[in-house]
Amino acid sequence: MKGTLIFVVFYSSYGFAHCNTILRSSSLSRNFEDSLRRIPRSTDKDETGFEDSNVQEVIFILLYCLFVALAILICGLIIFYNSRKRELRANRSRGDEYLLEPTSADHKRRNSSNIVPPEPTPYPITSGESDLRQTPSRLSNVECPPELELAPINEKIMYLHYYAEVEINEEDLDISKGRPLGSGEFGIIRKGFLRSKNSKNEEKESRLEVAVKLPLNEYNQIQQELIYDELKVMCAVGKHPNILALVGGITFGERKMIVSEFVENGDLLSFLRDNRIYFTNDQWTLETEQDSLSLVDLLSFAFQIAKGMEYLIHVPCVHRDLALRNVLIKKNRIIRIADFGLARRHKNKDYYKTQSVDTPLPIHWMAPESIDKLLFTQKSDVWSYGVCLYELFSLGKSPYENVIKYDQRDFYWKYVLSYLNEGKRLAQPAHADAEIYNVMKLCWDLDMNSRTTFLDCIEFFEKELKTTSNEYFLDLTRKLRSETNNQLRLSNWLSDEKHCDS
């Protein structure tokens, strides 16, 4: 760039030194000089103090200054263009440093850690079983500070690692241009198909239905970073039958993408609202119609959400945005906890403390300490779980929808906080008995250390399920075992594809 600047300035100076010669050799310069000769010469100075003989010299000086200014402007534009080009190239290649294979030093450091890695839930399910598994994430080459060793992954995202083996070739991904599956503050989710050649028959191409999360604006660097951080969180979380499974990610393209399993029935909140008319308290059997919705289904959903959240405790990961809109449901009634977009530490405090009740932010699901002090812990997730129980057993009602006062719409979060600090809580939903409502109230204790635990909730709803329909519980156990195998096949999908490429 410096060479370009020197050349332009040198060229400009050289041209101005010969400017007089060029003008004299042209018809324009001859006309110009003839006009100058017709001007009466005088040795007297005019009012400005300049002699007439200096007029031509002044003109050349002005022209010289003009051309120098233009040359500097052109150089500045070239410098800006090249700088912007380098910045965009750097943005596209962001994340390359994370695509590294595990080293022996990493394994050594990991094995010496006191962190207990989560294991997949063994089935059949019992209340005393562990949800620990070996997660695929590890710390990056930047050493994690000792004080963060036992901290939730939310607090050390910059030290999390993204593995190369989950990278997807964007050319193998077809993204639907139709109606999106969902959208949020920073990202949009679309249906897609991931192509892969069968490792046994390279001529046969198979396609996997997937959900693809992209930034709303691919040119927004902040949104790109949020998608990339969520991708690393999902890598760290690993696989569990009640957690949305990561298929892979795209980090080399112009935009970052998260590719996850496709869940056909959408979010649980919409499912409950759409199926209210089919709700029945009749005894469930294996012959029960697929479209029906019964109390035992609600108990199953509550049980599964608690199982998924208990698993996150052992990762460890704080979800921060647990709500039925972020819980997906498959056709076989198995749920997946999704949307880890808020699992990262958000830098903008106003994102949570919104002044508008019309903004779809999780104020109604947040614990008082989260609203007031932005303190998010596993205990604040327990509070959110209690609100999920209200949504479940009210068949999708919005929490606090009847307590909003028009004159309290400004600084709404302050009103919600005051409402909770006064000891007021959500009412008992129509389809929750006294025992279930008591569990909900245990989730909403102002003292976070006095709240119930997910393990207690698992034990409670397991007992309720077995009492209501042991046949349903045994069928659920078989389904969860099958889902564990299905998620393992998702991992093998990319392995087969890379095997074919090699």
Swiss-Prot record:
CDD domains linked to this entry: PTKc
Region (Disordered): 99-140
Signal peptide range: 1-19
Catalytic reactions of this protein: L-tyrosyl-[protein] + ATP = O-phospho-L-tyrosyl-[protein] + ADP + H(+)
Inducing factors: By UV irradiation, high temperatures, starvation and old age.
GO annotations of cellular component type: plasma membrane; receptor complex
Active-site residues (renumbered): D321
Topological relation to the membrane, as annotated: Single-pass type I membrane protein
GO biological process terms held by the UniProt record: cell surface receptor protein tyrosine kinase signaling pathway
GO MF annotation terms: ATP binding; transmembrane receptor protein tyrosine kinase activity
Major enzyme class: transferase
Disruption phenotype: Increased life span and resistance to UV irradiation and high temperatures.
Keyword Disulfide bond: no
Topological domain ranges for the Extracellular compartment: 20-58
Keyword terms: ATP-binding, Cell membrane, Kinase, Membrane, Nucleotide-binding, Signal, Stress response, Transferase, Transmembrane, Transmembrane helix, Tyrosine-protein kinase
Taxonomy, superkingdom: Eukaryota
Cytoplasmic side: 80-502
Assigned EC number: 2.7.10.1
Protein kinase domain location: 175-473
Predominant localisation class: membrane
PANTHER family per record: PROTEIN KINASE DOMAIN-CONTAINING PROTEIN-RELATED, TYROSINE-PROTEIN KINASE RECEPTOR
Similarity field: Belongs to the protein kinase superfamily. Tyr protein kinase family.
Function recorded in the entry: Receptor tyrosine kinase which plays a role in promoting longevity and resistance to stresses including UV irradiation and high temperatures, probably downstream of daf-16.
Protein name, UniProt field: Tyrosine-protein kinase receptor old-1
Organism in which the protein naturally occurs: Caenorhabditis elegans
Phylogenetic lineage: Eukaryota, Metazoa, Ecdysozoa, Nematoda, Chromadorea
